[in-house]
């Protein structure tokens, strides 16, 4: 029937249930496509320098998705491409995922540890996503974290960047310390702090340049490039990188492995809540009774003592009362009575 009609006429003759089904199915595919495009994988650029035998921390934050089965790590070198870790399946000796939750429900941390690093670990590491049905994954040549490994017999590098803090916990309003030690000189160029990774990262402190007012440098020594973050809030949560830049050509020369900052809201204790829930000038009737009960009892005790003393005085003998109360006139009458007896 619809084959001989135009598209609008055909749709007009369809039952309402088919029209509803068409409306549901078409946006469904579009929304699924947009949700896949909303994914964003954030990882530091590097290069990072690690000594042979140490542990390498590779950070990766996926924004907009928390599906473990669709994320994996791939190492690309001049020789080949190798899968380092797959969150969906497989056994990878020496590689462990970082178990860490984020404050945002759709932001997930897919960072990994590589233990006992060797020279074979030199290369560029990509945190990539795949569709879950095939092993095809998308990688871009300008992304990934490059890693350099110093062997036991290699000469000392001209620069080391050490960020010893993997995780820092703070409370709203606190001042947080982010540690960075730079050993060596390297090429001429500044040291900068960044929050985040990829194109969305933000420069927060530039030694010798313009910086945010809430960040201050510590600089306890010439090698100390640590900073203080004052009055932190939930917006300050994230990963911070201490990075060395080369002035000519203007490029990133070396990066630290990053420090993750988590900020929690300041909580009020139960005792503080009791004191702050009611004004200090108000008091319940029970409280008034507790305060005034000792005072009332004290007044009753004093009154009772006074009554007992008055009662004891009124019951004294008449002779004692005459002697005690005799005045000058009474003394003369007593003297006259004694003379008459003589």
UniProtKB/Swiss-Prot annotation:
Cite the Ig-like V-type domain residue spans from the record. 33-143, 157-258
**Which residue ranges run through the membrane?**
288-308
Q: Which residues lie on this side of the membrane: Cytoplasmic?
A: 309-342
Alphabetical list of Gene3D superfamilies matching this protein? Immunoglobulins (2.60.40.10)
Query: Which superkingdom, per the lineage?
Result: Eukaryota
Which residues belong to the signal peptide in this entry?
1-32
Is Cell inner membrane set as a keyword in this record? no
Q: Name one GO cellular component term.
A: plasma membrane
| Coiled-coil ranges from the UniProt annotation | none
* Compartments where located: Membrane
Q: Which PROSITE patterns match?
A: IG_LIKE
Which residue spans belong to the Extracellular compartment? 33-287
Q: What's this protein's name?
A: Signal-regulatory protein beta-2
| Organism expressing this protein natively | Homo sapiens (Human)
Give the organism's phylogenetic lineage: Eukaryota, Metazoa, Chordata, Craniata, Vertebrata
Its gene is SIRPB2
């Amino acid at each position: 029937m619809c084959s001989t009609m135009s598209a609008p006429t055909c749709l007009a003759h369809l039952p309402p249930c088919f029209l509803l089904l068409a409306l549901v199915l078409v946006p469904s595919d579009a929304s699924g496509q947009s949700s896949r495009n909303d994914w964003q994988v954030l990882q530091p650029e590097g290069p990072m320098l690690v000594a042979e035998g140490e542990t390498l921390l590779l950070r990766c934050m996926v924004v907009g998705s928390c599906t473990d089965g669709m994320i994996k790590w791939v190492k690309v070198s001049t020789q080949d491409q190798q899968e380092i870790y797959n969150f969906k399946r497989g056994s990878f000796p020496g590689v462990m995922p970082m178990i860490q939750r984020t404050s945002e429900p759709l932001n997930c941390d897919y960072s990994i540890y590589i233990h006992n690093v060797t020279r074979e670990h030199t290369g560029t590491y990509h945190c990539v996503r795949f569709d879950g049905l095939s092993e095809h994954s998308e990688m871009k040549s300008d992304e990934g974290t490059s890693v350099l490994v110093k062997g036991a017999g290699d000469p000392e590098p001209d620069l080391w960047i050490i960020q010893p803090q993997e995780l820092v916990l703070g409370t709203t309003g606190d001042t947080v310390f982010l540690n960075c030690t730079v050993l060596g000189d390297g090429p001429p160029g500044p040291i900068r702090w960044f929050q985040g990774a990829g194109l969305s990262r933000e420069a927060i402190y530039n030694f010798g340049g313009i910086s945010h007012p809430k960040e201050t440098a510590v600089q306890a020594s010439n090698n100390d490039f640590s900073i203080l973050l004052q009055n932190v809030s939930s917006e300050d949560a994230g990963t911070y990188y201490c990075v060395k830049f080369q002035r000519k050509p203007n490029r990133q020369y070396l990066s630290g492995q990053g420090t993750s900052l988590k900020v929690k809201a300041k909580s009020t204790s139960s005792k503080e809540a009791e004191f702050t829930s009611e004004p200090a000038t108000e008091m319940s009737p029970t409280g008034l009774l507790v305060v005034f009960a000792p005072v009332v009892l004290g007044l009753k005790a004093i009154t009772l003592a006074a009554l007992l003393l008055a009662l004891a005085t009124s019951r004294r003998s008449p002779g004692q009362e005459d002697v005690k109360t005799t005045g000058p006139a009474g003394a003369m009458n007593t003297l006259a009575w004694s003379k008459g007896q003589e």
